[in-house]
Every structure is written in C-alpha cells, then in structure tokens.
Amino acid sequence: MNHQSLSAFIWSVADLLRGDYKQSDYGKIILPFTVLRRLDCVLESTKAAVLAEHEEKKKLGLNADPFLLRKAKQSFYNISPLDMKKLMGDQDHIKENLFSYIQGFSEAVRDIFERFEFYAQIDKLAKSGLLYQVTEKFVNVDLHPDKVSNSQMGLVFEELIRKFAEISNETAGEHFTPREVIRLMVNLLFIEDDQVLAKAGVVRTIYDPTAGTGGMLSVAGEYLEEHNPEARLTMFGQELNPESYAICKADMMIKGQDPANIKLGNSFTEDGLENDRFDYMLSNPPFGGAARL
C-alpha cells in the first residue's frame, strides 16, 4: 500500500466522526491516533522483553529507564501490559484502559500526546460513544516498520496534515514542502562536502528552525545514509505548531534520534537551541502565514 492509499484509509476514520465533530477538528483525533498506532507497532516485537525487564528492575529497586530503552531498541518504551489490540477486549473500559496505556509510555512520548491535547479528545470520543469504534479502526491499520518505512510514514503524516489544512482553509505552504524540492535543497547543501561526508564514522549535525513534521530533516538523513551508511547525522529542530511538533518528535524518536533535540516554540522569539551550533541548516519558513515576531 503506497502512502496515498494508506493516508486515504486512515482518513476514512472521518466517516465515523462526521456529525459529532466539525471537519476542522478531524485532525485532533486522526493525527494522535496515527502516531499512537505507529508507536504501538514499532514496540510490538520487544514488548514482552520490556515488561519482563521492568518487573525485574522494579524488584531490585533500580532505575529501569536505561535498561528498558536497551530492551526496546528504541529511544522510547511502554511498560503497560496493554497494547492497542488488547484494548479491543474490554469495550466497557476502553477509555480508562487507553489512558492507562498512554501513561505507560516513557516521558518523551507522554509529552507528545499532551501537546496533541489527546486526553481531552479521548474523553470527548468516549462521551460521543465513538471511542471504541475509532480505536478499532486504527487497530486494523498495520503501521509496523516492516510494512511502512519511516520515509513512507513521514509522507503519510504530511498528506494527512495537507488534507486537514485544506478543510480548515489554512495555507498548505505552512505545513508541506514537496519532497522533490527538499531533495534538491539537500543535494545543494551537501554537495560541497561530498568527500568529507564519505569518510567512515563521520558525524555531523543539522538544524531546521521551522521543522514542521520533520520532512527536511528526514530527507537529509536519508541522503546521507544512502551515500554513506557509516555516517551519522544528528538532527535538531524547532516547531511552532504543537501538532506538527508532536509528529516531528515522534518521527525523530522512531528514527533513533534524541527527542530532546526537537523544541516547541517560535524559533525567532523563543530560540530553544540558542547556545547550540550546527554543521548544516535548512528551512522552509511558513511564507504563507503572517509573521509572528
């Protein structure tokens, strides 16, 4: 399934929301659920090992965090015995169990869902009698990395955000830069350093002050990996929109980047990385929107 087909399937959740939600609010449900399902699928293969490690370290009274990260093989984990499929086994307690499942994630992931204001949306879905149906819809979407690559997942997020921007009468340019444009920018950025970037073990940093969902950072990382699998590109970014920030942070975590490198806020007036220096920088400022300086 290509990213357009996958986006269309996820978008079909809107059929369940119609009547209870305004079109402009669909994104408040669909985006965080898409992130949740992706994280759920990423952790699936290491879930049992993480739970066993958590129990062992709890008995010993140790700080389990570094051990759990190692077992999860990611920069995040979940210590709840629940997962999205198990949520389907108890329709009467879907809200409480979903809250509990999200609380089982490590701190950086919980921050993502707080930025989405996801708990309020879960509560609203429960009151509307839609929570179980919506959750079930996402359980039927396989977003495992073996089926959907990080690159494809990034395109899915961008496509969903583009749809939401259209129905909200927002400017698409604030949310989306075509991938062919990004690839050209990345080629121009790296071309002078081709010989340096070809060296084994080379490490470089890159920064996007208007990161959006992280598309530019991701393409830069893909470029370097294609040209030198032994190179390491550490990514930094800042984003003003809380939903785009949350998606970017989730995407960076799944790629093995440090989620603390992604900051929320206006990079012109609230520079979250003012004391840092970077090897490269690229950006597409939101020219379609009014400047907020």
Residue ranges and their predicted role:
Residues 172-283, 288-290:
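Conserved S-adenosyl-L-methionine
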Residues 1-194, 261-272:
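Non-catalytic, mostly N-terminal accessory regions of nucleic-acid modification and defense proteins
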Residues 293:
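A mobile, often basic/glycine-rich helix-loop segment
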